[in-house]
Amino acid sequence: MVKLADIPEYERNHLMSKLLPPLGELPWVANNKPLSEKKVAIITTAGLNFRQDSNFEFADSSYRALPRDLSSSDILMTHASVNYDRSGFQEDINVVFPIDRFKELESEGVIGRLADVNYSFMGGGMLPDVYEANVRDLAKLLKADGVDAAFILPVCPNCSRTVC
């Protein structure tokens, strides 16, 4: 990830102007089983979608489902930002969506199982409340699927400010 000091001043000022409201108390989640028994989902902010699914649009807070067995060649990056560097994704999808690494962790017994369906949002610096309804919807899907943990992968400075 690029360091804030390494990006142009106008972009750095834009990022720093996005004040985030306090999120309040964090809900306590009991960690009642080891990682080796947990079902884990990957959630990325890279703006990825299945080739036949709808592309992400500007200021899009929705998410796309990415089945675990989907071929990398069928996954597109339709992130709307013109400032978004796609070169890492073009070389190796695992840079923004570490699906192969998690399959390896599963086969090594480090995690119990990778979820059958994983997800992508398109980051881009919108405030967290813009995503809230869709995140709550996704949380219900993850819970219904028996997911115990999610690996959330913000892939740019704007995404990091939104997710964190």
Map each language-model feature to its residues.
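An N-terminal assembly and electron-transfer interface module characteristic of large anaerobic redox
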Residues: M1-C164
